[in-house]
Amino acid sequence: ENIERSSLLVVQIEDSEGVEIIKSILDVKGIDAVFVGPYDLSISLGIANKFDSEKFKAALDKIIEACKENRMPLGIFESNENRITKLKTSGFTFFCLSSDISFLINDAKRILINLKE
């Protein structure tokens, strides 16, 4: 009981099969949120990194609709401010802005630049 109160169960949708069965996934008791992995999803759809394609948008629309119907928080990995604004308007409620490795690389670059000065 304590684990349920202090845990968050987020399912990740990263392939076309996940999109197709999103409603069934959301029927599972205990899911707290859905997170879309856009890079893997676009590859699975055969349109690697083509996030403005109709096929990718249709997949997102299906996920968005299912999450809205189930009042399920929906997140995605996105660092572009313009796309974040559009995604927020369409129904996404949380965003992963970067990855741990990106933060580490950028910080290391900053330190090296400062050391050279």
Q: Where do the language-model regions lie?
A:
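Expand to "…catalyze enediolate/carbanion chemistry for C-C bond making/breaking, isomerization
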Residues: 1-117
